[in-house]
From Swiss-Prot:
Keyword list, A-Z: ATP-binding, Disulfide bond, Glycoprotein, Kinase, Leucine-rich repeat, Membrane, Nucleotide-binding, Receptor, Repeat, Serine/threonine-protein kinase, Signal, Transferase, Transmembrane, Transmembrane helix
Keyword Amino-acid biosynthesis: no
Domain notes: The leucine-rich repeat (LRR) domain is disrupted by a non-LRR region, resulting in the formation of two LRR solenoid structures shaped like the Arabic number '7'. This is strikingly different from the horseshoe structures of the canonical LRR proteins.
Active site: 676 (proton acceptor)
Upper taxonomic lineage: Eukaryota, Viridiplantae, Streptophyta, Embryophyta, Tracheophyta
Protein name: Receptor-like kinase TMK2
Species annotation: Arabidopsis thaliana (Mouse-ear cress)
Glycosylation sites: 41, 154, 167, 202, 237, 298, 377, 394, 401, 432, 437
Binding-site residues for ATP, renumbered to this chain: 553-561, 575
Origin: domain of life: Eukaryota
Catalytic reaction annotation: L-seryl-[protein] + ATP = O-phospho-L-seryl-[protein] + ADP + H(+); L-threonyl-[protein] + ATP = O-phospho-L-threonyl-[protein] + ADP + H(+)
Signal sequence annotation: 1-20
Side of membrane Extracellular, spans: 21-460
Gene Ontology molecular function terms on file: ATP binding; protein serine kinase activity; protein serine/threonine kinase activity
Length: 886
């Protein structure tokens, strides 16, 4: 009897096990959490008896959930990871929301298709223990920003992994390209995300066939070289469109199965390799909107459809036509630098003598190659020696390594070779008459021979140091006596003007500096006695297309400002002075005042590069500011199609202007009062930092001359009361104008706007009234700005500062150093760019430099106030921070 009862109990337990599968509770929770459409027949408690979309094995364990394309909505329950026999999880193309539950530990899981839903997140352990996982698709889900979790490294059976348009960020893991661990992975699709990495280069034996990484979002995107492709010899389809990849195309000779190759809209440069356009398997290729150079490729595959439309820098349009030999040689030279983007952007066409950056020609012969301070990496190519006409090679201030090629010693016409301030090593070739500058180079080459030569090198180094010190001592003594003699001469002959032979001159050939045997030739530009650049009228006519009206940037009381472009693309601003403004001023007086202005250098003052005096023409050449005036960005941003300035940017601009004016008032070698400070005299660069323009120009107008419609220099709305009434000028005049500019930055309104109601015409009066009434002041803030509690706090401080600066009595206005201190405390982070000045002479100008490079160097030099202007008086030390750094 006992045995019979025990047998019945065992049967009952077995029956319960059959009826109550371990997966039953999980599946019922799944059913109850979803809103099913149609009639899926999910009734009853046994999921194995539900519709064909649920599959079970012989043990009543759920092995497949295949409910894709069913119009299902709802959230997935968190316990799906308990379905330990699950092999297929397919919920794609529904309306599912919430997080995807963790499936960690499901060793039998092969397929996960969750694409085209509204899932919000992926758990970090999602892929843990999924050793059988082969197929994954997470495309088109609005996940919170996520990265590929480390747990994916366990899924070494992966065949295809797709996470397109699902807010993926960060880096692509190296292991996905390692054939040893992921030998089955053939498809990787990560398009339309926010990936920002450079590709790994140390993987091997990748089996990936389909690689889709196109359309990454954000500013950085995927970048760096694509040379990793040549290691991926199984590739059939590659799509990298819409990223920031740069450098040359790799060797494709090993990619014999490649059918489709799309790298449109990147920054790839260099030549299209023959290994690509001779690839017979290729049927679809897209290279448009890059910076590719050399001849237009001629693809030979029978059914290929090449897409070369859009920007590139091919020398000729006809496929397969060779470039000019000079072009080929120059491209070989920059190949050693990795085909830098700045060359690819500016070297257009098939004639390097037609204005290519860094290239100067005499006739059709290249005589000067000037690649100074271009951030170049790589080595010096021996192909420089192919240009027998070369007289100057300047590769200084780059990051070049390796040795100086022996072939360069064969250049019989070479007069100057400057490779200073690089990372070169090895022996310098023997040149006959060439002046070679190698300072800042030559540590031991990493070739294993340093130890053998250590003892001999030590003696050489000691001898060299002693020789150099003696030479420097002799040179210093010689310079001292020469300068002393010259000073005595000028004291004896104060009225004698320097002739062409007395001035340092710059030779310009084809609007660019070359080298002449005597050192003096050409009249395109030279250095005046004060070291500022004197530029010929012809250069400026060419740069502005003969002062074409289409090039007008603006009109002011002192004349018209034109945009100019030198032959190599360097942009300048040319102010053509009204003849009535300077007619009463003597030539010497005008030149001396220009000399004063060209020496005023600060990062927040627009650089005056030089001038032109020919006949009745009086022209000033300024630094070009690409983003135009501040007024364009605060008053006319809608009309110009610009984005409104956010408050933090306005605050930084205010600080920039304050620093510039502070420098003029107290820190320059002599005090300046601007007298016409306003948004149209504040210019913005591409980095949206501000520089003050037209400072000191009132000095160029003779007494009594009207600079605008008033009898004084200034603009209504910005004029301090005492200046407008009496003409009395102090630095507090500029402080008042600055206060009005702060009001404009805060409100987006003009200082004087006759289109407004009578009580709102004058901004300063209206602003004070609004500020006093705290309840109405928020209405005065520019609606284009987003304002929160934090910004409102700083806005109130700046508003109070604006009122102080525009006080009626000058004594109630703060000095600009106080203004700077207030604004500095509000700008959370401001880090000045560190730049070192490298003076070539007493004026910091290299006479063998092309005019465009002089302009660039002048901008560079202008950023270093400590080298161009004497330091501030010591008694200001406790009051001011650095005039450059604040």
């Amino acid at each position: 009897m006992i045995a019979k009862n025990f047998l019945l109990l065992l049967c009952f337990i077995a029956l319960v096990n059959v009826e109550s599968s371990p997966d039953e509770a999980v599946m019922i929770a799944l059913r109850d959490s979803l809103k099913l459409s149609g009639n899926p027949n999910w009734s009853g408690s046994d999921p194995c008896k539900w519709s064909m979309f649920i599959k079970c094995d012989a043990s009543n364990r759920v092995t497949a959930i295949q409910i894709g394309d069913r119009g299902i909505s709802g959230k997935l329950p968190p316990d799906l990871g308990k379905l330990t026999s699950l092999t297929k999880f397919e919920v794609m193309r529904n309306r599912l929301t919430g997080p995807i539950p963790s499936l960690a530990g499901l060793k039998s899981l092969v397929t996960v298709y969750a694409n085209d839903n509204d899932f919000t997140s992926v758990p970090e352990d999602f892929f843990s223990g999924l050793s059988s996982l082969q197929h994954v698709s997470l495309d088109n889900n609005p996940f919170d920003s996520w990265v590929i979790p480390p747990s994916l490294e366990n899924a070494t059976s992966l065949v295809d992994f797709s996470a397109v348009n699902c807010n993926l960020s960060g880096k692509i893991p190296d292991y996905l390209f390692e054939g040893k661990d992921f030998s089955s992975l053939t498809t990787l699709k990560l398009s339309y995300n926010s990936l920002v990495c450079e590709f790994p280069m140390n993987f091997s034996d990748s089996r990936v066939q389909v690689l889709m990484l196109n359309g990454q979002k954000g500013r950085e995107k995927l970048h760096g070289s694509i040379s990793f492709l040549q290691k991926m010899t199984s590739l059939t389809n590659v799509t990298l469109q819409g990223n920031s990849f740069s450098g040359p195309l790799p060797d494709f000779s090993g990619l014999v199965s490649l059918k489709s190759f799309n790298v449109r809209e990147n920054q790839l440069s260099g030549l299209v390799p023959s290994s690509l356009f001779e690839l017979q398997s290729l049927s679809d290729v897209a290279l448009g909107n890059n910076l590719l150079q050399g001849p237009t490729p001629n693809f030979t595959a029978p059914d290929i459809k090449p897409d070369l439309n859009g920007l590139n820098s091919f020398c000729l349009d006809t496929p397969g036509t060779s470039c000019d030999p000079r072009v080929n040689t120059l491209l070989s030279i920059v190949e050693a630098f990795g085909y830098p983007v700045n060359f690819a952007e500016k070297w257009k066409g098939n004639d390097p003598c037609s204005g290519w950056v860094g290239i100067t020609c005499t006739g059709t012969d290249i005589t000067v190659i000037n690649f100074k301070n271009l951030g170049l990496n790589g080595t010096i190519s021996p192909r420089f020696a192919d240009f027998a006409s070369l007289r100057v090679i300047n590769l200084s201030q780059n990051n070049l390594n390796g040795t100086i090629p022996q072939e360069l010693a064969k250049l019989s016409n070479l007069k100057t070779l400057d490779v200073s301030k690089n990372r070169l090593c090895g022996e310098v070739p023997r040149f006959n008459t060439t002046i070679v500058n190698t300072t800042g180079n030559f540590e031991d080459c990493p070739n294993g021979n340093a130890g053998k030569k250590a003892s001999s090198n030590a003696g050489k180094i000691v001898g060299s140091v002693i020789g150099i010190l003696l030479a420097l001592l002799l040179i210093g003594v010689a310079i001292f006596f020469l300068v002393k003699k010259k000073m005595q001469y000028h004291k004896m002959h104060p009225q004698q003007q320097s002739s062409d032979q007395d001035a340092f001159k710059i030779t310009i050939e084809n609007l660019c500096t070359g080298v002449s045997e005597s050192g003096f030739s050409g009249n395109d530009a030279h250095l005046g006695e004060a070291g500022n650049i004197v530029i010929s009228i012809q250069v400026l006519r060419d740069a502005t297309y003969n002062f074409d009206e289409k090039n007008i940037l603006g009109r002011g009381g002192f004349g018209i400002v034109y945009k100019g472009e030198l032959h190599d693309g360097t942009k300048i601003a040319v102010k053509r002075m009204e003849s009535s403004i300077i007619s009463g001023k003597g030539l010497d007086e005008f030149k001396s005042e220009i000399a004063v202005l060209t020496r005023v250098r600060h990062r927040n003052l627009v650089v005056l590069h030089g001038y032109c005096l020919e006949g009745n023409e009086r022209l000033l050449v300024y630094q070009y500011m690409p983003q135009g005036t501040l007024s364009r960005h605060i008053f006319y941003w809608k009309e110009e199609g610009l984005r409104p300035l956010e408050w933090t940017r306005r605050l930084i601009i205010a600080l920039d202007v304050a620093r510039g004016v502070e420098y003029l008032h107290t820190l320059a070698h002599q005090s300046f009062i601007h007298r016409d400070l306003k948004p149209s005299n504040i210019l913005l660069g591409d980095d949206m930092h501000a520089k003050v323009a037209d400072f000191g120009l009132v000095r160029l107008a003779p007494e009594g001359t009207q600079s605008i419609e008033t009898k004084i220099a200034g603009t209504f709305g910005y004029l301090a009361p005492e200046y407008a009434v009496t003409g009395r000028v102090t630095t507090k005049v500029d402080v008042y104008s600055f206060g009005v500019i702060l009001m404009e930055l805060l409100t987006g309104r003009k200082a004087l706007d006759v289109a407004r109601s009578e009580e709102e015409v004058h901004l300063a009066t209206w602003f004070r009234r609004m500020f006093i009434n705290k309840g109405s002041f928020p209405k005065a803030i520019d609606e284009a700005m987003e304002v929160n509690e934090e910004t409102l706090r700083s806005i109130n401080i700046v508003a109070e500062l604006a009122n102080q600066c525009s006080s009626r009595e000058p004594r109630d206005r703060p000095d600009m150093n106080h203004v700077v201190n207030v604004l500095v405390s509000l700008v959370v982070q401001w880090k000045p760019t560190e730049r070192s000045s490298d003076s070539e002479d007493i004026y910091g100008i290299d006479y063998d430099t092309p005019l465009p490079q002089l302009i660039l160097d002048s901008c560079f030099f202008g950023d270093n106030t400590l080298t161009s202007i004497p330091s501030r008086p010591s008694e200001l030390e406790s009051t001011f921070k650095s005039g450059q750094g604040r």
